[in-house]
Amino acid sequence: MGFIPQMFFSLLLASWFTDLRLRLKCTGFFKTVIYMPNLIMASAFSMLFYTIFSDAGPINNLLNSMGLPTYRFLAEVAGARGLIALMNFLMWFGNTTIVLMAGIMGIDTGIMEAARIDGASSFQIFRKITLPIIKPIMAYTLVTSLIGGIQMFDVPQILTNGNGNPDRTSMTAIMYLNKHLYSKNYGMAGALSVILFIITAVLSIFVFKYVTKDMVDTGAKTSKKAKK
């Protein structure tokens, strides 16, 4: 759930940090801050969130001090799923931002200067120049984020005590696979592994083809014009 806002905010931050006209201060500090969660172990991050959002945690203490009732984040479907998505977002959007920044910084500045001279706005430059050029990098980040989401295990495992509560609505495919391995049901675990591989491969190919479709079409048109 978290990789969609992750891509949006990462792309937004990457465009801000690489825009020299904004003259943002302390960009190095902010880059370090947004990347820091990526360096924290997922298990430690999960325990931190478990403590903060527990029934007697700081968040509920704050709600009680404001006269609001205790909200059982880990006992509600929306609460548990929302926390997992938030943790996944915080842990990985910094890495995605750095990757997208590298792609944007690799664009020839002369192209953008020429577009500005021709009267293009910043939004037009971003939509017509930046996005098409970094599409391969976006495809890479989307595919890796998709695979990471399918393979998610440690965060929901720790946050829900391995049960995927409430009512197994937070149980991931890898948690289900791990339960079969733990119970020595190797046949079911092997079948599930193959199914996960097929699903991952199909979705990855679909995302990559969809994102890079315009590039292939443009290349084909250019090739036809060259032959003529």
Language model regions located:
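A structural signal for multi-pass alpha-helical bundles of membrane permease subunits
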Residues: 1-228
